Amino acid sequence: CCYRCRVENTGNEQLAKLNFDNEYCLFSRRYRREEDAPCGNDPMLMFFTSGTTGYPKIATHSYKYPLGHYITAKYWHCVSKDGLHLTISDTGWGKALWGKLYGQWLCEGAVFVYNFDRFDASDILPMFAKYHITTFCAPPTMYRMMIKEDLGKYDLSSIRHATTAGEALNPEVFRQFYNATGLELMEGFGQTEMTLGIANLTGMT
C-alpha cells in the first residue's frame, strides 16, 4: 500500500501531498551516526514522580533505560512475536512507556492501543476476542471492575498471560480471575525512578 502524508499550511490554501515510498527511496540505506549524537548515559526522557512526599520531582532516564525493560516484556509480560499485547495505562504515567513500548518492541511484540476517556469493563472485555489479544496488564482495580462485569459472559481464551501492577493485588481478585480464566495474575512493582523492580516472572509461583 502507499502511505501519504498531508501537510497543512496555515498561511494559505495549498496542501502538500507526499508519497511515503517515493520519499523513502531518496534516503541513503547507510545510517551515518553523528559524533555528537545522543547515546548511552545522555538524558533521553524525564518523568515526573507522583509527588506523594511533597511536590512532584523529575526522574531523568538515559538512553540505556529502555533496555532495562526487555526483562519487563520478555519475562513478566511474556510478549511474543506472534502475540498482541495490551497494557492499560494513561500516557501520563511512566507505566505507559515501560508497559507498552520499550520492552515490548525490543521483543518484537505488537502492541494494542485503545483510547478511552473513562475505563468501562464492558467496552474492554469484548476486545480480547475481537482482536485476539494474547498478553494483558492492568491495575488490580480494573481487574475488579472486569470481575464485577461478569467475566463468564466474554471469550477471554486468547489471553495466554496476565499481569498486574500499580497497587496491592487482593487475593479475592486473584482467585476469581483464576477461576474464570485459568490464569494466575503475575504481580509486579516498579517506580517512576526505575524499571520493574520486583515481580513474579515466568516460571515463578
Report each predicted region and the residues it spans.
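Short beta-strand elements of ligand-binding domains
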Residues: 2-11, 17, 164
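Conserved pre-ATP/AMP-binding loop-to-beta segment of ANL
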Residues: 6, 16-48, 55, 78-84
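Conserved structural elements of the adenylate-forming
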Residues: 27-31, 59-80, 94-95, 143-148, ...
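Conserved S/T- and glycine-rich ATP-binding loop of Class I adenylate-forming
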Residues: 43, 49-52, 85, 128, ...
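Short hydrophobic "strand-cap" motifs at the C-terminus of beta-strands
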Residues: 46, 88-89, 114, 139, ...
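Conserved AMP-binding/adenylation subdomain of ANL enzymes
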Residues: 67-84, 91-134, 149
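Gly/Ser/Thr-rich phosphate-binding loop
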Residues: 106, 133-138, 147-205
